[in-house]
Amino acid sequence: MTALRRRLLAAAMLLSISLVRPVFAEDCVPLPSTVSPERLAALSRGFNADGWINGAPPSRALLQQLRKAGMSHVRLPVPAERVMPRFAATDERAATLRVLDSALKQLTSLGYSSSVDLHPGERFNRLHKDDPDAAMGEMQEAWRALAEVIRTHPADRIFAELLNEPDIEADRWQKEVETLAAFVRGLLPATTLIVGPVNWQRADSLPRFRPLADPDVVYAIHFYDPMVFTHQGHWDARDPLHDIMDLPYPINAGDPKVQALRQDLQARGAVKALAMLDTAIAAAKDKPGADRWLAPALAWQQQFSRPIIVNEFGVLKAGAPRQSRLRWLAEVTAYARAHCWGWAHWELAQGFGLVDAATGKPDPDVMRALLGAPGRLERSPAARGDR
């Protein structure tokens, strides 16, 4: 990509999220300039680097390839228990913060913006349900430590995501996140915050979430609908979705492949998986596409005029037909572009990853699907087959 083309693309993205309705976007909600257009532009195209903080980092060459392709944002899930005093010793917390600092330095040097995502596991989630005061204390201590790292980096390049997928009741989270946001704002006065609703941050959970008083906030949703498609071939053999394989997208009751899968599940007595499939077939009858599932978030944005990012979405590679996976990814990012939402694919190189395991490089078809470039995706499934 030439320097001129990079400048033109950046200018186009800044235009798309200004108060002037963009000529190329289908339905962008006009937003007040409470979050700078440059920061929203930085969130426009990204991926999750899950496993970097608590595992092996991606290679610099891979990060450079993705940056050159047009990715501008990396979401860094930080295992919450590794930076909370209740769950980790001082040495472990310090080591985790050093890894985070190194990651932010490298990403910034490559031209990325980064989100620091406080990403809890089962231990914190149990505490969060059982002891609200203790959980709030742990979140505050975690952010006190994370802020020490974040404030050494450019404020316009780092975002602070307060808590991934809060696993408590909506009313309680509303009160907690207002308190937590005020606390983090005191630590990071110039940093844009990212927050989301409960219930796995689903789009249909956002209407029950009130925007914060803090104006410098982006609102994050996660998208994996229909789950029977995106999580087919599930890694846990006890999960009913483990029994579903080769389900195409869109889901159509008249599709011979869908009918064959139903018959197979019936023959194997996979009752729960069959019920989940039938529910998905019924849901897709009238509106099978992403717009059906994402409409509640759009309605919320139209009401409150706040910026949105879909900072998790993806399809498990183990069971999904390849062309259907590409089609779903392309549909999600096309919807996001049409509404001037940012996005971050889940994830880089694991079960949902955009990296081709055989080459260790970005899968070119996945990149075309995500970035909306023309190519083989525009050919019909009938012409290519769906594997």
Question: Model-found features: residue ranges?
Answer:
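Catalytic domains of carbohydrate-active enzymes, especially glycoside hydrolases
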Residues: S59-P79, P296-F304, T333-Y335, H339-G342
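Boundary at the C-terminal end of the N-terminal hydrophobic targeting segment
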Residues: V23-A25
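Aromatic-rich peripheral "rim/lid" segments of glycoside hydrolase catalytic domains that contact
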Residues: A318-R387
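Hydrophobic beta-strand scaffold residues
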Residues: S114-V116, I308, W343
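N-terminal export leaders
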Residues: R5-A10
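Active-site mouth of glycoside hydrolases
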Residues: D27-T192, P197-S205, D216, V366, ...
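N-terminal secretory signal peptides that target proteins for export/translocation
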Residues: M1-A3
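Active-site region of glycoside hydrolase catalytic domains
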Residues: D27, S33, G137-T279, A283-A284, ...
